Structures are given as C-alpha cells and as structure tokens.
C-alpha cells in the first residue's frame, strides 16, 4: 500500500497543506520547527489514532480552530481508497472511508504504518507504558477488532478503580463489596484477551526481531523479548517495573483460557491491598515486556548504540510482521528525524533494511544525514509551507502549497 496524496486542514501549523506522494522513498526536508514532522505525524495518526509526540488529540488542532482534518488517498493493487478523520477539539472525532461515515477505531483496518522516531529509544530505556503502547498499537494494526477490546478494558478498569477508591474512603472490607465481584469478572474476561494477544504477538515477533537486529547492528547479540505479567507477581511494586529475575515471565500465556484462572486468582489475592490503595494492582495495564541482549536486560545494560539498534529492530520487526500478515501490501514506513540520531554505519544498514518496502517517508533537518538513494524525491518545507515537492504525472490530485499557521 502507498499514500498517493495527503491533505491537511487546520492540522498543527498548517491552515491547509496538499502533497502528492510517490512510491518508494520520499524525503521531507527543512530546518527544525518548519512543520515537516507534522506531515508524517498526520499519517501516523490515521493508522494508530494517536500521536508519537503528544498524548492528547487537542494539541493536533491548529491554534484558533475547532477541528483538524486529515485526508489521504491510498492505493493498493490498482485500487484507490479515500480515508479521512476529523479531530475535534471539544467533541468526539469523526471518520470517513470513501465518503461513508465509519467508527474512528476502524481506520487501522484500512491503513497501516510503522513510525521510527527519536522517542523510540524510550522503548528500551523508558517506562513500561511505552512498551505496552507499542504492543497494543501493533495488535490493533494486525487485528483491528482488538481496538474495541482495549477500549472496553479501559472503561472496566476506570469503573473498578472508582469503586475501590469509594470503598477505601468509606472504610469497607473485602467481604462487604459484592459489586466488586462483578467488576472483577469483567476485568478478568477482557484483560485475559489482551494478555493472551500480547503474549502471542511477542512470540511472533521474536524471529523477526532477531533478523532485524542483525540487519541494523551488523552483529548478533541474541536479542529477545519476553512478556512480564503482574498477575504472576506476589507483590507488584509501585514503580511498575518488570522483575528481571523472571518471576513474572508470561511467555507461556498465549491463550485466553490459560490466562483466566491465573488472573482470577491474582485479583482475589490482591484485593486487600487494592482496597488499601484504592487502585487495581494487577492486569495488562501493569504489565511489561522485557528486552534482553546477550541474556541481560537491555534497559540498564545495553550501550547507547545497542539500545538504538534494539529500538530500530523492534520497529523493523513490527513492519515485517505486518507485511507478512497483510492483504493490502506493505505498511508505510515513516522515519522521523531518525538518521540524525545514528552513526554512519547504522544509517547505511537501516537504509538497506527499509529499501524493499513499497513506500518510505523520511524527515530530516540536514539533507546530508539521509543516504543518497533515499533522498532522490525531496519535499522541501519552509515556515509551514510546502515549497517544493515531486509532482508525478499519475498523481490523482494536484499538489498546492500549505499556508503558514505558526511554527510547530
């Protein structure tokens, strides 16, 4: 799959922007703060329903506007598809596919992308929340129905936490809360699906991770990934950090029916502590995935270069998995200011690894940071305007310049 045309309205610093895109590699180049990342951020939003830079959608709406619009013309095997999302500042977002309204959470069914960014280093060195988000985004791209499961879990968790906080405030004991039993069952039923799906995903990623790491690093350091489950811990810590001893090793849980009894027992075991804290202490919202190199946790032991290689390998492995499973072609690869973070050797190896994908979109502040064969088609961005872009004769819509709406 490729993006033939991207159109933005009141998105970030663009009042309006239109750009026609080519198969293969396209480089968006411009000084920092000009708006080049905003273009690829918009495409990332279409496939993940979120931004890699901010946690709230409101930040994506141009200052002074009430909504932003992202439109993309997609093409696969000669067929075209138009997808659109309207991001509203004070109302629910809205989506369309070929002019027909659809649920926003259905968009990943039609378009998938994998984004590489400087923030990816936090996948190795950062908190568990980033690794959970990585897995969940990939789950939804592979199996779009899981977007509903994840939303249902968030709602059940919120309701259960509200009940626990109320019980703590009123000094109620565990045997006085029959309503909590209902929410326990719901949390276990939904959460077990997520735990099993993540476990199966990590298992599928493992061989791709090994190949991708070798391709990027040029050496085999035995990269591995293993789920770490809070339902297996006797005493989940407040810092939400995986147990490096393996006490929380959840690699064997890839089926929902295997997770349910263990989750049920953990909920019962932790109820007294949860009533003390007013908080749900076990479940997929407290889990992690442990990355290892040469048998040691990458977090805390891997060098800066090894950490970067692992982060890039995780994203490449994700892309290969989507490519293998997809019936709509390759995911679009988005490399946002990544080459500036890498040494010359890793730049070359990463460029070689992504060259075979149908479409690769790259941003860079310095033209020379990008290997030459990836920079042939360049889109120049200046002050929130597209000042130069490729104009393929086969493009279905003309490109027109964006307008300056403020730096971003």
From Swiss-Prot:
Q: Which SUPFAM superfamilies match?
A: P-loop containing nucleoside triphosphate hydrolases
In terms of Pfam families, this protein maps to: SMC_N
Q: Name one GO molecular function term.
A: single-stranded DNA binding
Per the record, the GO terms for biological process are: DNA replication; DNA synthesis involved in DNA repair; double-strand break repair; SOS response
Kindly state which keywords UniProt assigns to this record, in alphabetical order: ATP-binding, Cytoplasm, DNA damage, DNA repair, DNA replication, DNA-binding, Nucleotide-binding, SOS response
User: Compositional bias (Low complexity) at which positions?
Assistant: 389-402
Recorded GO CC terms: cytoplasm
The UniProt annotation puts the region (Disordered) at 220-252, 389-408
Residues bound to ATP: 30-37
> Where is it localised?
Cytoplasm
Report the main location listed first in the record: cytoplasm
Q: Which family does it belong to?
A: Belongs to the RecF family.
Q: Give the function comment from the record.
A: The RecF protein is involved in DNA metabolism; it is required for DNA replication and normal SOS inducibility. RecF binds preferentially to single-stranded, linear DNA. It also seems to bind ATP.
The protein's name in its UniProt record: DNA replication and repair protein RecF
Biological classification of the source: Bacteria, Bacillati, Actinomycetota, Actinomycetes, Micrococcales
């Amino acid at each position: 799959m490729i993006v033939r045309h991207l159109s933005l309205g009141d998105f970030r610093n663009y009042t309006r922007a239109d750009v026609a895109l080519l198969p293969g590699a396209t480089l968006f180049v411009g000084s920092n703060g000009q708006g080049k990342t905003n273009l690829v951020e918009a495409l990332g939003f279409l496939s993940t329903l979120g931004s890699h830079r901010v946690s709230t959608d409101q930040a994506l709406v141009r200052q002074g506007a009430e909504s932003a619009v992202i439109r993309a013309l997609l093409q696969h095997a000669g067929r075209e598809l138009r997808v659109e999302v309207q991001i509203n500042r004070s109302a629910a977002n809205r989506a369309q596919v070929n002019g027909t309204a659809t649920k926003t959470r259905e968009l990943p069914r039609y378009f998938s992308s994998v984004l590489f960014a400087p923030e990816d280093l936090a996948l190795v060195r950062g908190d568990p929340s980033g690794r959970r988000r990585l897995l969940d985004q990939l789950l939804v791209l592979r199996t779009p129905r899981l977007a509903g499961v994840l939303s249902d879990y968030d709602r059940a968790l919120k309701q259960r936490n509200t009940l626990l906080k109320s019980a703590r405030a009123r000094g109620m004991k565990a045997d006085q809360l029959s309503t909590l039993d209902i929410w326990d069952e719901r949390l276990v039923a939904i959460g077990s699906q997520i735990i099993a799906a993540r476990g199966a995903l990590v298992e599928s990623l493992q061989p791709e991770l090994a190949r991708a790491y070798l391709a990027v690093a040029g050496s085999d350091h035995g990269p591995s990934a293993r789920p770490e489950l809070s339902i297996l811990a006797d005493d989940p810590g407040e810092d939400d950090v995986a147990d490096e001893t393996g006490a929380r090793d959840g690699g064997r849980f890839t089926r929902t029916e295997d997770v349910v009894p263990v989750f049920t027992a953990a909920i019962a075991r932790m109820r007294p502590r949860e009533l003390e804290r007013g908080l749900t202490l076990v479940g997929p919202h407290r889990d992690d995935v442990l990355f290892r190199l040469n048998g040691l946790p990458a977090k805390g032991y891997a060098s800066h270069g090894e950490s970067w290689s692992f982060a890039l390998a995780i994203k490449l492995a994700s892309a290969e998995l989507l490519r293998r499973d997809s019936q709509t072609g390759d995911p679009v690869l988005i490399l946002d200011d990544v080459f500036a973070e890498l040494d010359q050797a890793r730049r070359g190896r990463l460029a070689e690894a992504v060259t075979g994908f149908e479409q690769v979109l790259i941003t860079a502040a310095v033209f020379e940071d990008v290997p030459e064969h990836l920079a042939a088609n360049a889109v120049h961005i200046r002050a929130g305007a597209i000042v130069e872009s490729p104009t393929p004769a086969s493009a279905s819509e003309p490109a027109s310049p964006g307008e300056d709406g403020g730096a971003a």
